[in-house]
Amino acid sequence: MANNQKKILMLGGLRYLIPVIQAAHELGYYVITCDYLPHNVAHKYADEYHNISITDKNAVLELAKELKINGIMSFAVDPGVLTAAYVCDKLGLPGNPYTSVQILQNKALFRSFLEKNGFNTPKSRGYNSIEE
């Protein structure tokens, strides 16, 4: 890897990521993938792989700091979107705001957002446990 080559961390390793990895390579990026499944096919196309769950946002953040990445993304892997936003916020990288992604991924938060902003929405209530 050249010293000035930009690094992108891609969360996940499913086959859908292969064309994205190839496009990143064509743009000159050093591509790093991570998830907890080392045999996922897309890892073979990356320059580097790390065995870290994409839902462990703090572990991914530490990896991103260690690797000094220039960008992070989750493509076709919904659980990684929140982690990518978290890392972007913490490292000052371009991306979707963490709070916005939280609202969009949590139905109770999204319905509350709609209601607070004057949208027509059915009455609803979110629950966090069976006891509720």
Model-predicted regions and their roles:
Residues 1-100:
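ATP-binding N-terminal substructure of ATP-dependent carboxylate-amine bond-forming enzymes
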Residues 103-132:
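Active-site nucleotide/adenylate-binding loops and adjacent lid/helix of ATP-dependent enzymes
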